[in-house]
Amino acid sequence: MDLLTLEGWLDNTAFAVLFLTMLLYWCGAAFPQWPLLTAAGRTGMAIANLCITGLLAARWIEGGYFPISNLYESLFFLCWGLTAMHFVAESISGQPLVGVVTAPVAMGITAFAALSLPPEMQQSAPLVPALKSNWLMMHVSVMMLSYATLMVGSLLAIALLVVTWGQPVNLKGSSVGTGSFRSRRPEPSLEASTGNGGTTVLTPPALQLSLQRLTLAETLDNLSYRMIGLGFPLLTIGIISGAVWANEAWGAPWSWDPKETWALIVWLVYAAYLHARMTRDWQGRKPAILATVGFGVVWVCYLGVNLLGKGLHSYGWFF
């Protein structure tokens, strides 16, 4: 089997495995009494990560350079980072809901790369002169890992918003998300006769968050903060290394290129998130909304800017 055939087999296998993994995690969340579903989903995520690792290794051997120079390669590297950070988040929390939100995004990325990109975009090509640098691996890989980590943190924040949707719940505690307790606004109650001259107070179930969901909300809030706290330094290192590389390649560390501008916007959004958590003691829904905004901004920075087809970072242009 030649490398091209192996690559085609691995990218399609990664997509199929991630699709099944997504279904397993969703079924595991719907039927928590069947823990084997979640265990199978975890195994599927590991298999997908190994398939992508093999794909990237084959591309590296074929091209002779770190495989992150075009859109196809960067999408699979992003998916590799996403599946790797999935295991980091799941090992920290032991919460299977992590896979419920990460598996569909990873599956969507592989589907776009393997099934939507034209064949010429999937082929390995010689590096353009500007990319023939040792900074390629340092800058681009760190940036992609930061995107993957921030995406996982933001996806967990989105899950928190879904879990607490329509509920006036506040999480209060330390800035690092530990030692928190729950508080809810007063909820309307109803009085009903007991039949023996007394009354009992009833609280409408629809207006309550169960203890299990409150605990889940706390876990998601804490885990989202930890993952974003991990991704933000990676993003900072990636931006700084890019500035150093740009200064060597083009004579200026910053040129307000569209990709550079949006990377700065991403940095500012997550800096605001961390600032609010550390100095304003934000927890729960408010920082989750900010992280959700960050999720969209990351995608604009990574993929949306490529739609312009302009600037020094337009190597991923595909129209």
Swiss-Prot record:
Q: Where are the transmembrane segments?
A: 14-34, 46-66, 74-94, 97-117, 142-162, 227-247, 254-274, 288-308
Q: Give any single GO term for biological process.
A: cytochrome complex assembly
The molecular function GO annotations come to: heme binding
Alphabetical GO CC annotations of the entry are: plasma membrane-derived thylakoid membrane
What is stated as this protein's family in its record? Belongs to the CcmF/CycK/Ccl1/NrfE/CcsA family.
Q: Quaternary structure?
A: May interact with ccs1.
Name of this chain's protein? Cytochrome c biogenesis protein CcsA
One Pfam annotation reads Cytochrom_C_asm
Gene from which this protein is expressed: ccsA
Region (Disordered) spans which residues? 175-201
Protein's organism: Thermosynechococcus vestitus (strain NIES-2133 / IAM M-273 / BP-1)
Return the Polar residues bias intervals.
Answer: 191-201
Q: How does it sit in the membrane?
A: Multi-pass membrane protein
Report the InterPro entries cross-referenced here: Cyt_c_assembly, Cyt_c_biogenesis_CcsA, Cyt_c_biogenesis_CcsA/CcmC
Q: Which UniProt keywords apply?
A: Cytochrome c-type biogenesis, Membrane, Thylakoid, Transmembrane, Transmembrane helix
Q: Which domain of life is it from?
A: Bacteria
Please explain the role this protein plays, according to its UniProt record.
Answer: Required during biogenesis of c-type cytochromes (cytochrome c6 and cytochrome f) at the step of heme attachment.
